[in-house]
């Protein structure tokens, strides 16, 4: 986003700075001092810097509102900042004030920003969904400024946008459809979701499951050329369907407790790992569900935890070589993915202040996969580019094929697939189910979805 926004509004030098280890304070009148707010902490707090190198204080006030009052995550704050910096660059490039709201609606600053978003959609600079989000976030920014009376009535001669009521079709977690009235605006950017073509499934993104031949090639290269930790990460994705965020926030004690307290299920030879909720293993939206992990994989992970390689990595990390540490650490002792629990631990100041905190979001794992794919392509292997999340889709389709062999009515396996995939909404599961009916079995499965 940043580079395209900068090039489109090249006159503006506005940018985002981040304040690390941010803990907001409040003025305590009794002691005439500023004290830190309890339980409010942000590892990377965004600050929008204008072209004259001054802080855009309106945005800072909004970010503090999101952090303190709405308890929004660091990731959400960064995402909002990336949208508001685009609006700031627009203001500077056009030399318009945020309160430029003349009588004619099309001249108002918000309407003109809306027009630039539509122009960029046509030029292919941004997607309709990105433009829609950006416009909505700018309007929520205005809502905050109005609600907090930051502007006087004299300054607000006209409204930045008009509110409208509309109805949307919603789907319950059970698949039932109902109509719901929602508030919208006359500046809403409408778009139709892109149709799914070829071998795609939609599950928190557009996924491309590996074909059986691609999976075979990938596993061969994974075994021959990848590090042991990256092998295990990929095996967890392929054989449990877990997301990268979940895999990389598993702690050593989770593995050891499974072995000590559980017996392997004699039907499918798996252990049960509870993720999400209070487990301190992160999931999408904190959704709590069970992962079924093959017994052989738990054994392999436990052996890895006893290895010199893991001990060396753990000794360099925050949690040291203790069971509270992550299973998966880079060579430098950093987590592949920073967990919510670690952020909370930093908030509680459990670590030395001398230790510099940095957020990790799986980039090291993605780079390892890219390196492996490049090697496969260099060797002329017939395999497409894919992501770690595509391994989850591969698990989903493999599971579907296996389960479908044991029932006459495909609807009977929907709850089972939903549970194994950890889908909060059954419609995501149905996307996988549909792939069976849009397939010609020329190869074991040509994955497709018509969502």
Named regions from a protein language model:
Residues 59-78, 82-177, 220:
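N-terminal core-binding DNA-recognition domain of tyrosine recombinases/integrases
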Residues 390-423:
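C-terminal catalytic core of tyrosine-transesterase DNA break-rejoin enzymes
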Residues 421-446:
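Catalytic-site neighborhood detector that most strongly recognizes the C-terminal catalytic loop/helix
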Residues 294-383:
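Active-site/catalytic core of tyrosine-dependent DNA strand-transfer enzymes
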Residues 155-214:
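Flexible interdomain linker/hinge and immediately adjacent N-terminus
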Residues 212-244, 413:
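Basic, Lys/Arg- and aromatic-enriched nucleic-acid-binding interface segment
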Residues 147-152, 237-266:
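Short, charged phosphate-coordinating catalytic segments
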Residues 250-300, 307-325, 334:
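Conserved tyrosine-mediated DNA breakage-rejoining catalytic core shared by Y-recombinases
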